[in-house]
Amino acid sequence: DGVAEQNFRLRSEGVDIEGVVVESTLDGNYVKRDGILKGETISFAGLCKMACCNLAESFENSASVTVGYSDAISGARQIKMLGLAGTYTQILDENRPIMRGLSAPYGLSYTPGMWLNSIQVSKGVSSVTAGHEAITGQINLEHRKPTDDERLFVNLYFDDELKPELNLSTALPVTRDKKLTTIVLAHGSMDTKSYDHNHDGFRDLPEARAMHVANRWLYAADNGLQLRWGFKVTAENRLGGRMGYENSMRDQMR
């Protein structure tokens, strides 16, 4: 091709390097084009840019997913993809189907945003490997892993109405050989104020107190065998509707 032949000689002189670490920073939102399915990925850097407290608020800068309130009294939210309601969209937790049945209306608020490493969004009909619900698309959530190097992560957040939220994550090896690792995720929020900015006599948002705790374990053997297990506990109390309603009937029944 018009380039003269060049010969290079390698000599074992100089300094030996045991390893090289290459670090880079991903964009907040990017489209993955090297796979079979074209999809949008929201990285952890993108989640940090948004004041997202839960999964529903993680799609504020996403052009693929829109989130709206399906019930103003209870604060339930639903997603829309390709113009259809969220019942036609499959939500996966590390490729496992979640948010089915009774958890569907409130499942978007049961996953804190700071628990996630990334979110993958693919539009259109997807594979039925994980279920048949993916008609308009799939949303896969990647949580923080037990093998993360970050031993402790603490996040305290206040919104414009001074609603406090606390997120905690700690990952640590249980054994010295790091074959058995675990991670504890905790989230707490409290919104005890009532707001009626349009003065219609109804709360704009429900009063809510929530606590979420998750514990995940990973055992990775030398022969490639991996075992994963864990649990998640959710406790929540919501109060919506008229401004003057204070659960008087419930208190009388106790």
What is the predicted role of each segment?
Residues Q78-K80, R96-K123, V213:
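Short acidic/polar hinge/loop motifs at secondary-structure boundaries
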